[in-house]
Swiss-Prot record:
Stated family: Belongs to the UPF0194 family.
Coiled-coil region list: 108-209
The protein's name in its UniProt record: UPF0194 membrane protein YbhG
Gene source species: Escherichia coli O127:H6 (strain E2348/69 / EPEC)
Disulfide bonds: none
Any single Pfam family the record assigns to this protein: HlyD_D23
Entry GO CC: periplasmic space
Chief localisation class: periplasm
Compartment(s) of residence: Periplasm
Keywords, in A-Z order: Coiled coil, Periplasm, Signal
Signal peptide segment: 1-16
Gene: ybhG
Keyword Ribosomal protein: no
């Protein structure tokens, strides 16, 4: 008669254990089983020449894989090569002028300037003496007023020539003014800047891939005359691979930077990729229409960027991805 209560008691204990275990499993799934839905981020870049010109050649076509540093296309280099030659010549001229300013005047030039002063002084002395004689003759009415005026003009001209020669000799002996040297230096620096710009323009007439990727579109063909900045290629960036997902505020504490997650695609549901949350948006936004969970579409959510650590070529941009949080994914 005592066995029946014992059996009932054991049944109650077992039932309580089952309920407790189920509750624990449910809670663990709630805490560690967060599932989000996102897409592989679409990352493209438009490539263009920084300078304008005629397209000489294009080395790749749509669908080609490209590598960072690879030559993708070239403009006609000739105009930029000519501009570079002109810039080099400009630097040579400016450098020579600056060197002359620094060196000052040679002894031979100073001697020539001194001789010119002596010659101008002699001419002035003669003109002054002649003018003095003409004044005496004018007083005795031997010459006309016109003759006296001509003598005065000759004297004044000789005086101006003498002053110019004296100023030139003074400049030669004292060297070039600091302002003239500074101006020559500025002209040299300007010519050097023009040379650097010409070198850069020639370099930029070759289009180099900035990173690895896949060529999506080829917008022009050889022979096209482009303005600077005109799009030549559109490239899909393949590395790193990012997944964009959204989490609501209730689960935001689980989606912290550094948290590791598993990423599932329809093509390989049993073999997940591994990812790590790299960025959580600091501001909330309304859920984009691309999110596949209807319950979230009217909520305010936070955007996540998840870096795929073992990405391969099977992950295509725009592909839907299921993001699974849990102990098996691990924590940073």
């Amino acid at each position: 008669m005592m066995k029946k209560p014992v059996v009932i008691g054991l049944a109650v204990v077992v039932l309580a254990a089952v309920v407790a275990g189920g509750y624990w499993w449910y809670q663990s799934r709630q805490d560690n089983g967060l599932t989000l839905y996102g897409n592989v981020d679409i990352r493209t870049v438009n490539l263009s020449f920084r300078v304008g010109g005629r397209v000489e050649s294009l080395a790749v076509d749509e669908g080609d894989a490209i590598k960072a540093g690879q030559v993708l296309g070239e403009l006609d280099h000739k105009p930029y090569e000519i501009a570079l030659m002109q810039a080099k010549a400009g630097v040579s001229v400016a450098q020579a002028q600056y060197d002359l300013m620094l060196a000052g005047y040679r002894d031979e030039e100073i001697a020539q300037a001194a001789a010119a002063v002596k010659q101008a002084q002699a001419a002035y002395d003669y003109a002054q003496n002649f003018y003095n004689r003409q004044q005496g003759l004018w007083k005795s009415r031997t010459i006309s007023a016109n003759d006296l005026e001509n003598a005065r003009s000759s004297r004044d001209q000789a005086q101006a020539t003498l002053k110019s020669a004296q100023d030139k000799l003074r400049q030669y002996r004292s060297g070039n003014r600091e302002q003239d040297i500074a101006q020559a230096k500025a002209s040299l620096e300007q010519a050097q800047a023009q040379l650097a710009q010409a070198e850069l323009n020639l370099q930029d007439s070759t289009l180099i891939a900035p990173s690895d990727g896949t060529l999506l579109t080829r917008a022009v063909e050889p022979g096209t005359v482009l303005n600077e900045g005109g799009t030549v290629f559109t490239v899909s960036l393949t590395r790193p691979v990012w997944v964009r997902a959204y989490v609501d505020e209730r689960n935001l504490d689980q989606a912290q930077p550094g948290r590791k997650v598993l990423l599932y695609t329809d093509g390989r549901p049993d073999k997940p990729y591994h990812g790590q949350i790299g960025f959580v948006s600091p501001t909330a936004e309304f859920t984009p229409k691309t999110v596949e969970t209807p319950d979230l579409r009217t909520d305010l959510v936070y955007r996540l960027r998840i870096v795929v650590t073992d990405a391969d070529d099977a992950l295509r941009q725009g592909m839907p991805v299921t993001v699974q949080f849990g102990d098996e994914a691990g924590h940073e």
